[in-house]
């Protein structure tokens, strides 16, 4: 149990630092759409899709790696709470179209990236 807790802790810290770096780099590029948050969510969705596909095929993987990557890293990297706050800020500023676009791109983009990663991994390992 302690190993699993440490894996979540290490993965979460690493994912959070990655999210912060992406936000610092990409959020200033567009004043209405926080591109760093979007990038973090899309990358996280892709990684978790790839992880779930990999773990479903490689059943001998230590559970520590599973929680480090999915619960830890992807949990720290993806930013639903930040995303939600940013949408609320856009709404408060009266930028309803941008808020709706932000919701649309983050949610559908994340679903698409998860499905793409799962499909790519499954296709590459099919015999």
From Swiss-Prot:
From which residue to which does any coiled coil extend? none
Q: Where in the cell is it found?
A: Cell inner membrane
How the protein is activated or inhibited is described as:
Na(+) is not transported, but it plays an essential structural role and its presence is essential for fluoride channel function.
Listed GO molecular functions?
fluoride channel activity; metal ion binding
| Top-level taxon | Bacteria
**Major location (coarse):** membrane
Query: Which controlled-vocabulary keywords does the entry list?
Result: Cell inner membrane, Cell membrane, Ion channel, Ion transport, Membrane, Metal-binding, Sodium, Transmembrane, Transmembrane helix, Transport
Q: Where are the transmembrane segments?
A: 4-24, 35-55, 71-91, 103-123
Give the function comment from the record.
Answer: Fluoride-specific ion channel. Important for reducing fluoride concentration in the cell, thus reducing its toxicity.
This protein is called Fluoride-specific ion channel FluC
Phylogenetic classification of the source organism: Bacteria, Pseudomonadati, Pseudomonadota, Gammaproteobacteria, Enterobacterales
Q: Which gene encodes it?
A: fluC
């Amino acid at each position: 149990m302690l190993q699993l807790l440490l894996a979540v802790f290490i993965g979460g810290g690493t994912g959070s630092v990655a999210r912060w770096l992406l936000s610092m780099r990409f959020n200033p590029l567009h004043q209405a759409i926080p591109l760093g948050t979007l990038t973090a969510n899309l990358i996280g969705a892709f990684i978790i899709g790839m992880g779930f596909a990999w773990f479903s095929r490689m059943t001998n993987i230590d559970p520590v790696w599973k929680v480090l990557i999915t619960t830890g890293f992807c949990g720290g990297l993806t930013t639903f709470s930040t995303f939600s706050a940013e949408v609320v800020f856009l709404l408060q500023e009266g930028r309803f179209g941008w808020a709706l676009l932000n919701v649309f791109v983050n949610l559908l983009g994340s679903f698409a990236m998860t499905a793409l990663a799962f499909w790519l991994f499954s296709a590459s390992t099919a015999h």
